[in-house]
């Protein structure tokens, strides 16, 4: 039997969005997703796809690694 690894991803999306004075709706529109998707990412209920994570990072002028942090359990 193998060992099961779980991973929780924390992120800085809310902090970056708020420091840029953007609403969830504005960021969602820029990313081509729903406001609910942005809310779910910010609260950790949804881990974005790699293309969306890259798009968010580029939008804020930073790297995926600076925004998303994996906690391995």
Q: PLM features: what roles do these ranges have?
A:
Residues 11, 21-22, 48-51:
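Residue-level signal for the short linker/turn that defines the boundary of a DNA-recognition helix
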Residues 1-19:
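A short, Lys/Arg-rich alpha-helix, primarily the initiator
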């Amino acid at each position: 039997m193998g060992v099961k690894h779980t991973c929780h991803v924390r992120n800085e999306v809310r902090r970056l969005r708020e420091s840029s004075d953007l609403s969830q709706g504005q960021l969602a529109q820029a990313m081509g997703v729903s406001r609910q998707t942005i809310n779910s990412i910010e609260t950790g209920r949804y881990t974005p796809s790699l293309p969306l994570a890259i798009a968010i990072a580029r939008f804020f002028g930073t790297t995926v690694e600076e925004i998303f942090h994996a906690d391995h359990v």
